[in-house]
Amino acid sequence: MYLSIIILPLLGSIVSGFFGRKVGVTGSRILGCLSIITTTILAIISFFEVGFNNNPISINLFKWLDSESFNMVWNFQFDSLTVSMLIPVLVISSLVHFYSIGYMSHDPHSQRFFSYLSLFTFMMIILVTGNNYLLMFVGWEGVGVCSYLLVSFWFTRIAANQSSLSAFLTNRVGDCFLTIGMFVILWSLGNLDYSTVFSLAPYINENIITIIGICLLIGAMAKSSQVGLHIWLPMAMEGPTPVSALIHAATMVTAGVYLLIRSSPLIEYSSTVLLICLWLGAVTTVFSSLIGLFQQDIKKIIAYSTMSQLGMMVIAIGLSSYNVAIFHLINHAFYKGLLFLGAGAVIHAVVDNQDLRKYGGLISFLPLTYTVILIASLSLVAFPFMTGFFSKDFILESAYGQYHFSSINVYFIATIGAVFTTLYSVKVIYLTFLANPNGSVNYYKNAHEGDIFLSLPLVILAIFSIYFGYLTKDIYIGLGSGFFIDNSIFIHPMREILIDTEFGVPTIFKLLPFFLTIFFSVLSIVYYEYMPKVVVDFNLTNLGYYIYGFFNQRFLVEFFYNKYIVNTVLDLGGQTTKILDKGSVEWIGPYGFGIALVKASKTVSGLGKGVVTDYALYILIGACFYLSIFTFISIFFDLANSITLSCVLVLLGVNNYVKLNKNDNINENSLTSSFLWSNTKEMSKYTTKIII
């Protein structure tokens, strides 16, 4: 069963992509949806089996890398964190597949689209279920490639190609640092397996853990669109709306958050990394929600809303509330997917127009879409008893409940971000459905609700957006919940704040976000309905023009990057190419050698002037040249021969001298021994005579 969860989306992708002509358009849609729906059912079964029974499953397929000091296995694990991530990934994916049947019904390349969607789901499952950092990185790169393919699906659009390239290159920055972090893990621990790395984490130098954590955080910043590496996410809205719902709301953008949660046994031992996460999430929340307030494209507003909620998740990670972070991740996937699919239904109804200012009065034509977008928006602003309320407010309470200077400041900053979230949510609902009609007559003549393929996913996600948070809050954030006792996440005992959050936060600070949400919702509706002239008059002033332009142009971050980073790198690359590739390398190499030969041949050919005396001079010079060469060679060889002969003679003389010395020594030794022997004999005779 567990292996089927991994394999089925890949089979669906292969059939739709390589055999699309054989099975046809309808066949590719049916097979793609069936494979994902079957996988979703199996994932729900695994959620109950693994999560509630605390029975982690491990699957070893085969060895990938095998050396003396480093072994890597294709190993997949299903623990409580994995099955929790599989639920939003596969539920949203199956609903998006079903939704795409109606949304992409008139597209001539729907087989390719369904193949890309199934391949993305497969790569996301690899990322979530991998049992080591290298296998996780395979899925990490896979979802990046699939995102590139899906954003540029309509490749005849220049904006789509630019957006996909921007997403691809921006994520390369994060991937580079993630790779560096993996190298540091391998250098310091000798392994990339989760169990080995996490079991040795308490015994490593904190500075090394900080370096690893910062590298992992930068990788997560790019994938989860945090401030600094966020520019690709709003541009990625050029892709089809189902792609935005699947990739850029529910699954791929949460991969960075998942990476940090999975690495909790590592980063818990570095307070520096946690503090950076805390402030990074706070800045991202306010930054993105403030930009979203000044956007006019409905999909870009929802994209900046996604970025803001990802900042909330990073705040929870900085507070060491990993269970709250994963809970908010799952809740956010459902209501943000609903927002994107609802926006897709609106865009589909008004002939692909995405400008809010050309909507208005659509509540009469799209009552179901209005209802589901209202439900999703209420969940987004954490209205009481909606799904988002149980996780988003708990993050804010956790920030105040830690009782540190940084966390209390982050509480107020994130609350301001929540207020801006309320404002642009009301803006979307009001300008789209409640305001006076501002669009073309053709919009309203042709506006209609979608078919069953567009409507059913909206209803299902609306049910999730209402009830899922209430039904699962005790599983993820309840006191004494044993859902994560299989050590899939780790919270250091010194940083455990669940009880402080539940019982130590004053009631006023628990209710403050709710009161601000209600107050600013009413204020914004009154403002738009009864005082629109004030907004127009302010925008027409110089101050209003500059303020609106600054926020509408996203704090001029893209302008800064293009002017000071992109242009600098391009100039540096151009100069490098000019000096090295086009310069020294080619001058030393074939280009310069060819030019030298051509010039030499022209010089030689220019010597033929037809003057006899010049020719005689050339002959004389040539003869002298050849004579000098031969003379040098003869002298050189004579000198060499003389040296060789002298060396031979010297060696022979030395050899003879050594031999003569040896013979003389031998003769002297023989004479001495004979003389001594004869004297000994005579002495013995004389001694004998005396004795007689």
Curated annotation (Swiss-Prot):
The chain crosses the membrane at residues 5-23, 30-52, 81-103, 112-129, 133-155, 168-190, 200-222, 243-262, 272-294, 301-319, 329-351, 364-386, 409-431, 452-471, 511-528, 535-557, 615-637. Belongs to the complex I subunit 5 family. This is NADH-ubiquinone oxidoreductase chain 5. It is a multi-pass membrane protein. Its EC number is 7.1.1.2. It is found in: Mitochondrion inner membrane. It catalyses: a ubiquinone + NADH + 5 H(+)(in) = a ubiquinol + NAD(+) + 4 H(+)(out). It comes from Hypocrea jecorina (Trichoderma reesei). The gene is nd5. PANTHER family: NADH-UBIQUINONE OXIDOREDUCTASE CHAIN 5 (PTHR42829:SF2). One of its GO terms (molecular function) is NADH dehydrogenase (ubiquinone) activity.
